[in-house]
Amino acid sequence: MAYRISRQSVENMPTFADQYRDTPLPEQLIQHYLHHQGKAGRWENFMAFSDAVELSDRNTCYHADALARTGDEAAAMHAARELWLVPFSQPKECDPVFKLWRDKGNLDAETAWERYVISIEANEITLANYLVRFLANEYRPHASNLKLVHTRPTYVSRIDRYTQDHPRVRQLILHGITRLARTKPDQAFDVLQQYEQHHDFDPIALEAT
C-alpha cells in the first residue's frame, strides 16, 4: 500500500483516496503521500495537498520547508519560529527549515532564552541542556541558575546569590519560589518577601507565582 501511495501522481490522488472514503484510510493515505513528497523534495506536489488534512507533526515541518521552497519565505520563517518555540523536541523533518531560519538570522538572543525557559518550566532538562549552545554568553549564567533553582529549589533561599535586580534574575527567582512553594510554602513566602524589598517584580508575574 505504501508503495502504491508513493507512486500516485497529484492528479490521481483524489481518485485513489476516494476508493477508501468509507474507512479511516483517506487521511492516512494523504498523510503518507505528503510525507513521501516532502522527503523527496517534491514541494509543489506537497503544497497541492497540504490543505487536505490536518497535518501530522512531521508533515507540519515539511509544510514550513515547502513554503520556503515555493517562494513564501516570510510565511516559512513565521512557521519555523512557531515550530521552534516549543518545550519539546521536534521531528527531524524540521531540521532543514530550522537551519534555514537560523541562517537567515532569525534566532535572536531573546528567542533562544525563551525556549530555554519554557523547556525548564516543562521539566525538559535534556532539551534545555541542548539549547544552551544557542544562548548568548551573557545569558548562560542565568541559564545555569535557572536550572539550579528548578532542580534544587532551596537554592533560591540564598538571597545573596541573586541580588541583581535584572529581568532574567527576577524570572529565575520567581520560578525558584514557585518550585519551593510546592514543598515548603511558608519558607517560599518568607523568601519572596525578602526579595520584594530589593527587586522590582512585574505585578502580573508576581501574581502568577
List the predicted regions and their residue ranges.
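Alpha-helical solenoid repeat scaffolds
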Residues: 1-209
